[in-house]
Amino acid sequence: MIEKKKRATPWKSGKVISIRLRNGVYVLAQMVREPYLVFFNHFKEENSWKGVTLKEENILFCKAVTRQFLRYSPVTIVKDLEPLLDYRLPKEWIYSHMGGHPITVSVKGRERQVAGFGQRLSLVQADKDSGLPEDNPLMGLFQAYILPDIQEKDWERVGQAELMSIEVFPTLNERLYLCFLHGKNVNPELDISLGKPLPDDYETYIDILTNAQRQDASI
């Protein structure tokens, strides 16, 4: 049985939801500790999940999301799936230092500038389930540096870590659609932040990013 969402979905740890992406693709996610969602590598073109079992090895990524994401995304509560139990949030995250400048990106031979990216990235320890104080001298967000200044030689090491940003609609939705296309975790925000070459299918993600920034600038 699937219950259709009529208003912004209230948060409850363990609640399993599906999210409709573009082109009629659905993805499964689970609410854990607010505001974190765990997204699974379970995609379908029909919003029916019979026979699916949520397992840790099928997790794409875990990310903090805004209420705006839940309000504007087409979300459905899935009641006939058992949630993943005893999930613990990741202990390694990527911290983006403030004071960044616009980054020039190129997709399909077209160059554009995107803003809002830090000038330096660090891999940090942030054990959010430990109860330890998160008392670094900069922002109070993590406990220790693992790699203070991520370089190209570190890309493979940090590839599965998530930025400590909070995701919004519709950029997160497009990221999830890219995960569907590639059949694995894809992270355009991190690829842009690291200065990696961007594949052609990031074009829509960059369109969304630059359009949102133009709208913000006009307010």
Predicted regions: what is each one?
Residues M1-C62:
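Short N-terminal edge-element motif at the start of the domain
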